[in-house]
């Protein structure tokens, strides 16, 4: 990293790499808890509804801090917000014992980890909006967010064996160490964005006057930018982003939190016996997320399609293909078929992020963190609804004497996000735009 900074390696690339590692570690933590808690809870016979409640507590905390996260990043800087958030959740992971019988402690710890991590993604998008020029945004955001999926893949591959040999508590220790390590690296190598690192662009007259004044020795007073809350809340393009963010995270969180249970109970297959195949759905997300970013930037920079058409095209392809794969998933009763369907579904969902997930930087580059906070609030609500509802669906099936190994039991679980994907793609096609609507 030091060698890179000494060379003529643009600092913004270092920032993008660090935010990629940041999202990687965050999702290692989320997948790690789901695996460790599932093993510990199943060992003592915790019912599916209670499991769903504990797994969803993270999202209750997460939803509380999305908009405050965007506001904080706007006011004190995304760099500081990221550092404080990481240190907080890392300390909680390192100090809290994993005991399914101590539900109050688990509820509070997951709530506070959710609050801490809720500041992270609005802060990341504030940082990227400051550092990354428009022609690099699709691939930069896609690379950063692909860290989530690589982290999930790594967690699915590594943690089942760790739990088997070292116990469920060891997962928390590993997560805490990774969190602290990233915090130290971020503190050392990140910085506030200087104007000189970005490619030269024409600056507004106001900025030019400020620059002249600063060069003359004058002090330029920082301007407080008024956030157009009303226009944001009532903007149809923003709502198109919000709806798609909700659907993306509903599908992702249901699969992330309940796919281990589907393998264990639906297919009667131990995660430890699946080898590397269990990481393929998330690794596929990593690959397709970056493909989507590169394709989007190519279409835009070569002027093959407008920004608006590019976002709509990739979003539609991603969500529609994902919907088909989701609804086909419970029809496959073999491990290979399930891995194939979940890989296609999650991979194309990640491809669709080159549509809706970058769009807030198109429509509101100055308020990217705020719009991200608003849309990610919807995404977090999807986690609360989806994860909790799935637990209730499965518990209701058991109460009706339905076997969890029966594919009919799981159809509702996977059909709901499938239909949501189709609905959301239509909304984005109709209402989204790639034009700047907030100055």
Curated annotation (Swiss-Prot):
The chain crosses the membrane at residues 53-73, 81-101, 104-124, 143-163, 167-187, 232-252, 280-300, 312-332, 338-358, 367-387, 412-432. Probable anion transporter. It is found in: Cell membrane. InterPro entries: MFS (IPR011701), MFS_dom (IPR020846), MFS_Na/Anion_cotransporter (IPR050382), MFS_trans_sf (IPR036259), SLC17A9-like (IPR044777). Keywords: Cell membrane, Ion transport, Membrane, Signal, Transmembrane, Transmembrane helix, Transport. GO terms for molecular function: phosphate transmembrane transporter activity. Belongs to the major facilitator superfamily. Sodium/anion cotransporter (TC 2.A.1.14) family. This is Probable anion transporter 7. Gene3D superfamilies: MFS general substrate transporter like domains (1.20.1250.20). One of its GO terms (biological process) is monoatomic ion transport. It is a multi-pass membrane protein. Pfam families: MFS_1. Residues 1-28 form the signal peptide. One of its GO terms (cellular component) is plasma membrane.
């Amino acid at each position: 990293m030091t060698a890179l900074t000494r060379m003529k390696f643009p600092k913004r690339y270092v920032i993008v790499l660090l935010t990629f590692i940041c999202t990687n570690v965050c999702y290692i933590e989320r997948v790690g808890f789901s695996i460790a808690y599932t093993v510990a809870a199943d060992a003592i016979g915790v019912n599916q509804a209670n499991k769903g409640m504990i797994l969803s507590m993270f999202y209750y905390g997460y939803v509380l801090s999305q908009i405050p996260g965007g506001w904080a990043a706007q006011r004190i800087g995304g760099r500081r917000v990221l550092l404080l958030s990481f240190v907080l959740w890392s300390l909680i992971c390192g100090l809290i014992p994993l005991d399914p019988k101590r539900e109050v402690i688990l509820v509070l710890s997951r709530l506070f980890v959710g609050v801490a991590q809720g500041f992270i993604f609005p802060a990341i998008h504030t940082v990227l909006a400051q550092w990354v020029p428009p022609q690099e945004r699709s691939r930069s955001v896609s690379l950063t967010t692909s860290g989530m999926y690589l982290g999930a893949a790594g967690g699915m591959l590594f943690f089942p064996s760790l739990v088997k040999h070292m116990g469920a508590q060891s997962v928390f220790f590993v997560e805490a160490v990774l969190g602290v390590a990233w915090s130290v690296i971020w503190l050392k190598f990140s910085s506030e964005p200087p104007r000189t690192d970005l490619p030269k662009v024409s600056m507004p007259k106001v900025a030019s006057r400020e620059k002249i004044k600063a060069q003359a020795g004058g002090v330029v007073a920082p301007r407080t930018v008024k956030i157009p809350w009303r226009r944001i809340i009532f903007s149809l393009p923003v709502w198109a982003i919000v709806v798609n963010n909700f659907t993306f995270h509903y599908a992702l969180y249901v699969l992330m939190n309940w796919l281990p249970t589907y393998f264990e109970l639906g297919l009667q297959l131990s995660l430890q016996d699946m080898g590397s195949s269990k990481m393929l759905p998330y690794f596929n997300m990593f690959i397709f997320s970056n493909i989507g970013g590169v394709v989007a930037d190519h279409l835009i920079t070569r002027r093959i399609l407008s920004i608006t058409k590019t976002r709509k095209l990739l979003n539609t392809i991603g969500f529609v293909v994902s919907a088909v794969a989701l609804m086909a998933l419970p029809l496959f009763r073999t491990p290979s078929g399930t891995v194939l369907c979940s890989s296609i579904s999650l991979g194309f969902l990640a491809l669709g992020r080159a549509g809706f997930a970058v769009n807030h930087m198109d429509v509101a580059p100055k308020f990217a963190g705020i719009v991200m906070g608003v849309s990610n609030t919807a995404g977090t609500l999807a986690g609360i609804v989806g994860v909790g509802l799935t637990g209730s669906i499965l518990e209701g099936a058991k109460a009706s004497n339905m076997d969890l190994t029966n594919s009919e039991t799981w159809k509702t679980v996977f059909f709901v996000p499938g239909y949501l994907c189709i609905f959301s793609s239509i909304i984005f096609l109709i209402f989204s735009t790639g034009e700047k609507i907030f100055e």
